[in-house]
Regions:
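Cap/lid segment of the alpha/beta-hydrolase catalytic domain
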Residues: 110-192, 238
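Alpha/beta-hydrolase fold nucleophile elbow
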Residues: 193-204
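Glycine-rich His-Gly loop
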Residues: 108-110, 229
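A catalytic-pocket lid/entrance helix-loop region that shapes and gates access to the active site
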Residues: 213, 221-264
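Bacterial N-terminal signal peptides that target proteins for export
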Residues: 1-7, 228
């Protein structure tokens, strides 16, 4: 079934690419290092569809072409919460020197916590796609995603974000919209237009995110790929405990009474 789904997706994208190639106005748009000055240092909070206090953009970078990857720009930023005791959403946008008028938002994995889009060899950058993604609004998750741009309250413990309502809402759905809207502003500034086609792609946690944007923000995307989605957020939150229980021998079994005592 998975192979069939991927085949259907590939066929749909190929059909779209073929149709676009026959449109003379669909010629790739080219940028250079000098275009980075158009990125700016901030984005108005009013440009973001869900509530934020501010959006900071860091100094953009230009990555020269290699044998494996064409030249591209890197724009990173932090979306700050309304709650002064909340956690920021750190995000990254990769903008190819030769843009195919397409963009792709990449979903997370596990409990997130690191920016999903990374620099380096990427087949979609080679095809002229803008790539963008975030750490979902808390820091220190699995997989790593480069240097942390901004973090939560001073002295906070690694999992304290889960006790913050805005951070939980960000994980659940708002970070996808906030990251999307910030990326669209950056794309328009750099290329002077927004994508003609925009996609969301994710698996596991990212697959759940894909289902969520399909429900809440369908107008933002021309296509959504949701692979093996974790549809139960409660199960995802319990996953570390369940794994530990399954990996331990019977003598280490934590009974319900012990669990309640630990959590008391």
């Amino acid at each position: 079934m998975k192979r069939l789904s991927l085949f259907i997706i590939a066929a749909m994208i190929l059909a779209e690419l073929t149709a676009a190639s026959q449109d003379a106005s669909f010629k790739n748009k080219v940028i250079t290092k000098t275009d980075l000055e158009k990125a700016g240092t901030s984005i108005p909070a009013s440009a973001i569809g869900d509530p934020v206090s501010s959006v900071k953009l860091y100094v953009p970078r230009w990555v020269e072409a290699t044998d494996a990857t064409p030249a591209y720009a890197v724009v990173e930023g932090s979306i700050f919460p309304v709650d002064p005791n909340g956690w920021p959403i750190n995000f990254r946008v990769l903008l190819p020197a030769s843009w195919s008028h397409r963009a792709m938002q990449i979903g997370g994995g596990g409990m997130n916590g690191s920016i999903t889009v990374r620099e380096g060899k990427n087949p979609m950058i080679n095809k002229g796609f803008v790539m963008y993604g975030s750490d979902s609004g808390h820091q220190g998750g699995m997989g790593g995603g480069g240097t942390v741009l901004a973090s939560g309250p001073s002295g906070a413990k690694p999992d304290d974000w889960a006790l913050n309502e805005e951070a939980i809402r960000n994980l659940g759905y708002m970070q996808m919209k906030k990251t999307h809207d910030a990326a669209m502003v950056i794309i328009e500034r750099i290329y002077n237009e927004r994508p003609r086609f925009n996609y969301y792609v994710g698996g596991s946690q990212g697959g759940r995110e894909g289902l969520m944007v399909a429900q809440r923000y369908p107008a933002d995307y021309d296509g959504i790929i949701s692979d093996v989605p974790i549809v139960s957020l409660s199960t995802l939150m319990l996953a570390p405990e369940l794994i530990r229980i399954q990996e331990k021998p019977l003598s280490s079994w934590v009974t319900p009474d012990k669990t309640n005592a630990i959590r008391a």
